[in-house]
């Protein structure tokens, strides 16, 4: 069961030739989710092969580098004869401005757009096998991040034990794995907990968007399989990061380390590092012992299950 993250835009407020403004495409077993939609997002979708077929758009806040791609994307979806509704999730109090932005091309969209506010701590999307929740961030305007967390999976099935207990090979194996008792060949009843291990955790993906480091993010990102965190500046611009309510690479690394995240991806890289952003990653690595990534636009990460190596 796949969980793929494509980085469509990894840059800060000012685009560069190499980095577009914020946009992140997540494909979870065919469910296609877009997190933020900065200028140039639809071109990134074409260039990096994600396609336009998004089911939900999650907006972190209404700064231009996170939303100015919405009018063009909506127009293109209409040109492509989209018929399915599109749900846009946003922070409370931003619905009217987002509505105006959606209609900025001067006419009504060719398909239904639902704009739904979601407060930090609330579930934005309750889907089959996972949910997406909003969480509070600290920025210069009303903003929030999002966490995608999968349901627990059934434990590992012990086939040798099932055969030893007299369960015939076949459909009864699947019924046991799904939690249903079955009858063995000798007429005895075999319970699932006799042949199925404890539940195994699903995957957790966390996207902060623009934020200062905060304890709340550490809690939300606990044991995250992938944490995508604001890392706009290196240490040489720490005061600037504080003044603009962003994070440095080292601060992002510290959040990831305290959360026990497995992988950290650094995004929202300031244009001042267009020639060389390596100091941001180097400083993050000094604070974080896990895998630390500085994605380029177009990079794709496959998020494995927590027990993939077992």
Swiss-Prot record:
Protein name as it appears in the record: Ribonuclease Z
NCBIfam families from the UniProt entry: PRK00055.1-3, RNase_Z
Family: Belongs to the RNase Z family.
Pfam name, any one: Lactamase_B_2
Active site: 65
CDD domains: RNaseZ_ZiPD-like_MBL-fold (cd07717)
Catalytic activity: Endonucleolytic cleavage of RNA, removing extra 3' nucleotides from tRNA precursor, generating 3' termini of tRNAs. A 3'-hydroxy group is left at the tRNA terminus and a 5'-phosphoryl group is left at the trailer molecule
GO molecular function terms noted in the UniProt entry: 3'-tRNA processing endoribonuclease activity; zinc ion binding
Catalytic activity, EC: 3.1.26.11
Region (Disordered): 150-175
Note on how the cofactor is bound: Binds 2 Zn(2+) ions.
Residues that bind Zn(2+) 1: 61, 63, 139, 210
Known role: Zinc phosphodiesterase, which displays some tRNA 3'-processing endonuclease activity. Probably involved in tRNA maturation, by removing a 3'-trailer from precursor tRNA.
Subunit annotation: Homodimer.
Organism: Halorubrum lacusprofundi (strain ATCC 49239 / DSM 5036 / JCM 8891 / ACAM 34)
The protein's enzyme class: hydrolase
PANTHER family: ZINC PHOSPHODIESTERASE ELAC PROTEIN 1
UniProt signal peptide: none
Requisite cofactors: Zn(2+)
Domain of life (superkingdom): Archaea
Record field: compositional bias (Basic and acidic residues): 153-164
Record: residues binding Zn(2+) 2: 65-66, 210, 268
Keywords from the named record: Endonuclease, Hydrolase, Metal-binding, Nuclease, tRNA processing, Zinc
Presence of keyword Transport: no
């Amino acid at each position: 069961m796949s969980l793929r993250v494509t980085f469509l835009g990894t840059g800060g407020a000012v685009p560069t030739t190499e980095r577009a403004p914020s946009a992140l495409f997540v494909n979870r077993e065919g469910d296609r989710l877009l997190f933020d939609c900065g200028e140039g997002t639809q071109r990134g979708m074409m260039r990096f092969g994600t396609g336009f077929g998004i089911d939900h758009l999650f907006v972190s806040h209404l700064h231009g580098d996170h939303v100015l791609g919405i009018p063009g994307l909506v127009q293109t979806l209409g040109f492509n004869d989209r018929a399915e509704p599109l749900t846009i999730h946003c922070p409370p109090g931003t619905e009217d401005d987002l509505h105006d932005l959606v209609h900025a091309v001067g006419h009504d969209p060719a398909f239904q757009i639902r704009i739904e506010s979601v407060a930090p701590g609330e579930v934005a999307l309750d889907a089959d096998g996972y949910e997406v929740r909003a969480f509070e961030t600290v920025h210069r305007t009303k903003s929030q991040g999002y966490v995608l967390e999968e349901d627990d999976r059934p434990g590992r099935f012990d086939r040798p034990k099932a055969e030893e207990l007299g369960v015939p090979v076949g459909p009864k194996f699947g019924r046991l794995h799904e939690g249903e008792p079955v009858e063995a060949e000798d007429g005895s009843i075999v319970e699932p907990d006799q042949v199925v291990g404890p539940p195994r955790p699903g995957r957790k993906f966390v996207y902060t968007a623009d934020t200062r480091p905060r304890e709340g993010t550490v809690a939300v990102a606990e044991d995250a399989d992938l944490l995508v965190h604001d890392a706009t500046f290196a240490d040489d611009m720490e005061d600037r990061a504080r003044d603009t309510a962003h994070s440095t690479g080292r601060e992002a690394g510290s959040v990831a380390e305290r959360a026990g995240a497995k992988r950290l991806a650094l995004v929202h890289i300031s244009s001042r590092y267009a020639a060389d952003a390596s100091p941001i990653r180097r400083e993050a690595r000094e604070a974080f012992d896990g895998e630390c990534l500085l994605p380029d636009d177009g990079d794709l990460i496959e998020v494995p299950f927590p027990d993939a190596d077992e």
